[in-house]
Amino acid sequence: MSDFPATPGAPTPGTPSTPSTAGSDYTQRLARLEQSGIKRLLPTQAPYRWNLQRLQLGRVLDIGCGLGRNLLNCGPDSVGVDHNPHSVQTCRERGLNAYTPDGLAAAADCGPGSFDSLLVAHVLEHVEEGTAATLLEQYLPLVKPGGSVVMITPQEVGFRSDATHIRWVGFEELRIHAAKAGIAVRRTYSFPFPRPMGKVFPYNEFVLVGTVPA
């Protein structure tokens, strides 16, 4: 696996000093970040909206949907799931379909094969490798055979920007996750800028697009 140097002063993964993503304080932090700096003045989400829409993902299950930033850009009847009930409530207040894991399991229209695609954006870096594998194992059956899987993670500056990021997940790690889950990789790419920009631009992303076995 690729070796990413530890950030001085960052919390050690898995220790009590690592902030939680499950509480109301994390939801409030996400809401503040939505309105911070240049985001108040410019349509900074436009490139990322275009990137998702050009993939033509159909009905999407968005794992770790947060406040619905990506869910807003997904197809009709797409659904988000998040372990943070406060974030789920915010999504619903925005008119989005979102559930906690228990709520999703009980939803009549979210059974096996009911989604065209699975989106796992800015989630894998928040959890240990085994937990990430379990998430994929749990939710992949909800995607129809031949459907798409999109996994997105931050590059260097973005990784360092959040103390809840506990694990570096680059192209190599994404491919390993795909292989273990039986996902056929169609392509990987850096977005919105070429790979070297990840060392200076906080919103550069690793993207893997794959296919669920038929």
Language-model features and meaning:
Residues 133-145:
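A short glycine-rich, Lys/Arg-flanked "PGG" loop and its adjoining helix->strand segment in the class I
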Residues 146-154:
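Conserved beta-strand signature within the Rossmann-like core of class I S-adenosyl-L-methionine
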Residues 183-195:
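Conserved S-adenosyl-L-methionine
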Residues 158-173:
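Acceptor-substrate binding/catalytic loop of class I
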Residues 154-159, 193:
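Short "lid" loop at the C-terminus of a central beta-strand within the Rossmann-like core
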Residues 1-119, 133-136, 189, 203-207:
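Conserved N-terminal segment of class I S-adenosyl-L-methionine
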